[in-house]
Amino acid sequence: MKFFIDTADVREIREAHELGLVDGVTTNPSLIAKSGRKFQEVIQEITSIVDGPISAEVIALDAPGMIREAEELVKIHANIVVKVPMTPEGLKATKALSAKGIKTNVTLIFSSLQALLAAKAGATYVSPFVGRLDDISQDGMGIIEEIRTMFDNYGYTSEIIVASVRNPIHVLNSALIGADIATIPYSVMLQLSKHPLTDAGIKKFLADWESVPK
């Protein structure tokens, strides 16, 4: 399973990369705005840290506009993946970009049928948002299971990126279901290695070591 980090904070990306956990990066307009820096400057710095897929999102809402923006985005670096919203116009853009050999990540997916449409349009990645579904009392991980089953049934090669990850259980369940990728906030990524018994064990080892004659 691959781990992407879901942030535009270069410090977080660098620190997670040093842990050996980062296979790629997902950004969005909200994350870029939060960084307080220029869009292209942030993306270029990210590509210098992580040698893997870097998702950068279009802003246009019409297919021709999305295609134009996508063609500019991929000029930044060969690892750029264009994030496209799950809309009819987004599907048109995805199909056209796929035909041009431009990788796409169809985002804001909230149903397994939306993921199926994105795969049929030629999406490289599909990004279902599990946390936001959980927020409205729907089963976020349930749609990951449905998408995995459908893609396996019909041989779709689009990779499933589990997005809107809120906790380590989301990551665990994604792995058990067989999702290709989880894109994880830095705060959650740090939680993955934590267990109280690990901390207690280290504390005991250190205490025992103090009793060893020096």
Swiss-Prot record:
Entry-linked PROSITE patterns: TRANSALDOLASE_1 (PS01054), TRANSALDOLASE_2 (PS00958)
What is the protein name stated in its UniProt record? Probable transaldolase
- NCBIfam families given for it? fsa_talC_mipB
Cite the HAMAP family for this sequence.
Transaldolase_3b
**One GO location term (cellular component):** cytoplasm
Principal subcellular localization = cytoplasm
Q: Which InterPro entries match?
A: Aldolase_TIM, TAL/FSA, Transaldolase_3B, Transaldolase_3B/F6P_aldolase, Transaldolase_AS, TSA/FSA_arc/bac
Q: Report the sequence similarity comment from the record.
A: Belongs to the transaldolase family. Type 3B subfamily.
List GO molecular-function terms, semicolon-separated.
aldehyde-lyase activity; transaldolase activity
Q: Name one GO biological process term.
A: carbohydrate metabolic process
> What EC number(s) would the UniProt record show?
2.2.1.2
Entry keywords, A to Z: Cytoplasm, Pentose shunt, Schiff base, Transferase
List of catalytic residues: 83
Q: Where in the cell is it found?
A: Cytoplasm
Annotated function: Transaldolase is important for the balance of metabolites in the pentose-phosphate pathway.
